Regions:
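Bacterial N-terminal signal peptides that target proteins for export
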Residues: 2-12
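Hydrophobic membrane-targeting and insertion signals
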Residues: 5-6, 27-31
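N-terminal helix-cap/turn-to-beta initiation motif at the start of protein domains
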Residues: 31-49, 215-232
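Sec/Tat-exported extracytoplasmic proteins
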Residues: 45, 52-56, 228-231, 235-239, ...
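Calycin-type beta-barrel ligand-binding domains and close structural analogs
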Residues: 54, 97-217, 235-237, 280-401
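N-terminal glycine/threonine-rich, aromatic-flanked beta-hairpin/loop signature
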Residues: 62-120, 245-310, 400
Length: 401
């Protein structure tokens, strides 16, 4: 396991032991099977609310501020974003009546609340990747859910009662990409739910404890540590003259022969035009290097062998244009480099890559239409070829619609 993966898993496992209110033990396989025979969701029966429903409560603002003041590489907004990332749920209430239909309450774009009924099929139990002694119960919606696509799949733990607090809770992940992506998701992301009739004061006490412990012990002191090392711009890889890379275009032209909507075959120029549309160009950088740890939280921007800029960063409030991703700002307000502000995904897929949107201001980053993408510079040539092949194949398929 790489040091980056170790860091992510360690942080995630530690955070979850605090964030998740119940000291949950795994559901025995026999109990899950017995429950599933009658009604897979019967074990969840009751009315529940996610902890995240109260994350913006005024009572918590001083808690965020006090903790952020002691965290040199997190603004108050950055700490709130980190906590939100860990505990957020796409619903504000969930009612299980013992059947396989769940009544979710969601908040609409205009701020109003709407109840959505979702019928699910049980897809079996899966051990947690980060804790093999515990199980997920996994579900898939019978029909597509138009109101909120992220409810199509969800995985949950059976409710448990915390011996110290007496609070009953469970943990859940929701998504639209499949059960596999949830089971193997970021260890930091597990939304805790408590009973809907739990007094607000008790919920806020629990949330205060979560914030304090996460800030003091669970988040990495240098939030860029997850990306440590040098990354290469995917466009730089696409432009690489090595035969192994250039052969990708020959392969794709044959694979998509006669399918160009303009008529005839695609050319290499056609494929590169799609690359530039999706990834942007390599005009601003060919490589970026993350240096995080031992009191540093820096990024070095490279063009070839020339250092373009170097700056320290703080994790900041999420950008409105990319609310689901981590956001960073240069610690020096006078820094006007291309990466003064950026929003970034976590590394994902194989080979690991990430996307980010950057600019000299948050507003400039929001206007970026492409999604600049980088892969780790130390991956093998074979992995680089696979990354370009998968990306370009996806672009070509998209261009035909």
């Amino acid at each position: 396991m790489t040091s980056k993966k170790c860091l992510q898993a360690a942080v995630g496992a530690a955070l979850l032991s605090v964030c998740l209110l119940a000291g949950c033990a795994s559901v025995p396989a026999t109990a899950v099977s017995d429950t599933a025979a009658a009604s897979e969701l019967a074990v969840m029966k009751g009315s529940w609310q996610p902890l995240s429903r109260f994350e913006d409560d005024a009572v918590l603002q001083d808690v965020y501020a006090k903790n952020a003041a002691a965290m040199p590489y997190y603004s108050e907004g950055g700490l709130k974003a980190a906590v939100h990332y860990a505990v957020a749920a796409p619903v504000i209430k969930a009612v299980f009546d013992g059947s396989n239909t769940v009544a979710f309450t969601v908040r609409t774009a205009d701020g109003s609340e709407k109840e959505v009924l979702c019928e699910y099929t049980f897809k079996g139990t899966r051990p947690m990747v980060e804790d093999s002694t515990r199980n997920w119960l996994t579900f898939e919606a019978v029909k597509p859910i138009q109101e909120l696509k992220t409810l199509r799949y969800f995985v949950v733990t059976a409710p448990q009662v915390d011996k110290k607090t007496g609070i009953k809770s469970f943990e859940a992940r929701f998504g639209k990409w499949g059960i596999q992506s949830l089971v193997h998701g970021d260890p930091l992301k597990r939304a805790p739910f408590v009973e809907a009739n739990l007094p607000k004061e008790e919920v806020l006490k629990q949330f205060t404890a979560v914030i304090n412990t996460v800030a003091a012990e669970k988040l990495p002191k240098e939030p860029l540590a997850l990306y440590n090392g040098k990354w290469v711009n995917s466009v730089t890889v696409c432009e690489d003259p090595r035969p192994a890379i250039q052969n990708v275009y020959t392969q794709l032209i044959k694979e998509f022969a006669g399918q160009n909507p303009k008529g005839g075959d695609y050319t290499k120029e056609d494929i590169m035009a799609l690359v530039y549309k999706a990834f942007g160009t390599a005009d601003d950088f060919t490589h970026i290097e993350f240096v995080a740890g031992n009191g540093k939280n820096e990024i070095i921007v490279w063009k070839g062998n020339k250092e373009v800029s170097r700056s320290s960063y703080i994790q900041d409030s999420a950008h409105a244009a990319h609310p689901a991703y981590r956001a960073f700002s240069a610690t020096d307000p006078s820094f006007k480099g291309k990466l003064a502000h950026f929003a970034i995904t976590i590394p994902h897929a194989v080979p690991p890559h990430m996307h980010f949107w950057y600019g000299t201001s948050v507003e400039e980053a929001a206007k970026m239409k492409s999604a600049p993408t980088c892969i780790r510079a130390d991956v093998s040539e074979e992995e680089m070829v696979q990354h370009i092949l998968d990306s370009c194949r996806s672009f070509l398929k998209g261009s035909m619609h």
